[in-house]
Amino acid sequence: MALVSRNNNMRTLAKLAAPLATAGTRTIVDNKEAIWNGVKWIWGKLPKGKKGKNGNGALIAHPQAFPGAIAAPISYAYAVKGRKPRFQTAKGSVRITHREYVSVLSGTNGEFLRNNGTGPNNDFSINPLNPFLFPWLVNIAANFDQYKFNSLRFEYVPLVNTTTNGRVALYFDKDSEDPGPDDRAALANYAHLSEISPWAITKLTVPTDNVKRFISDTSSGDPKLINLGQFGWVAYSGPTAELGDIFVEYTVDLFEAQPTSPLLESLFRESASSVQTRMGLPYFSLEVASATDLVWQARVPGTYVVTIIFNSTVGGLTPSISGGGTINSSFSVSTAGSSAYVANITIRVNANLSLSGLTGATNAQLFAVRAITENAVQVV
């Protein structure tokens, strides 16, 4: 009979292998879960500003900086990109989404300066046919009767470096006829306000409602009923300089197609009564009207062809432009009794177009229309 040698240790190890493997796996899983829970706990304690997917949007940590403060780096650049307008149609309406340039924001020697310091308070009333805010949209809105903003946001993009002092502010007022803030105390009381240093970017979202309003194609409507409100900006405690640019982004619905409203401005002043009559868009305003001088102010950036006719007892005139404007080409005819001046001009920021050296100037009328510099005024 042959002897057989048996080793029960192998059978015992085989029986223990499965439980040991399961226990080891559970231990690894438990350890991973503990590590993951620890990472989540640390992540939850981090400030929200440091939780970006990458470091591009994270705030810079600085000693002694208050939470929410924005640190000033040595230099900072903002990319301003063009955007294609989007059009949608539905149930007799047209929806437009676009971004436009509004104006440069200027400061003056530490003063409290609102809307660059010139013009009526309601220049920037929110209505699609206002060329001060929507210079591109007016060409489309002139073909409709009603509008409704679905979204509206203004953005300030700086032009200055991080050593520039002062502050800039964007504000919104629901009443388009309110006079606007005259000091910092009044500015601080606005419910819709965004203030920041002039070297940083800021945005102001305007609250919109679901109300259809009429487009302002005449001067006889009640501004409180036809406008969504008014927008404005302020610079204070800073230098005399162009601090930054203002842009507007919007989505607006236009309703009820109509014959095109006048896009040519006609501004007539009758000297005996000093009454001014305007038809069309408000590109220019008559600031000075005397027997020797006529001065119009332009505040909407762009290029125009301007025609001015007036009465005078003696021929002769001297044209000039001051501020942020350039006369590209011009032509004039002046005789005793009546005179005419035609010019192609470009307005970059508030500018005054003047006719001086007049004698006995009386009734005056200005016509203005958007153009390009190639629409040169010349006599061949």
UniProtKB/Swiss-Prot annotation:
Stretch list, region Involved in encapsidation: 48-53
Keywords: Capsid protein, RNA-binding, T=3 icosahedral capsid protein, Virion
Segments of this protein annotated with the region P domain, projecting: 255-380
Keyword RNA-binding: yes
Record-linked InterPro entries: Capsid_prot_S-dom_vir, Viral_coat
GO MF annotation terms: RNA binding; structural molecule activity
Highest taxon, organism lineage: Viruses
Main location as per UniProt: virion
Cross-referenced Gene3D superfamilies: 2.60.120.20, 2.60.40.4030
Chain residue ranges for the region called S domain, virion shell: 93-254
GO cellular component entries: T=3 icosahedral viral capsid
Family: Belongs to the icosahedral plant coat protein family.
Protein name per Swiss-Prot or TrEMBL: Capsid protein
Upper classification of the organism: Viruses, Riboviria, Orthornavirae, Kitrinoviricota, Tolucaviricetes
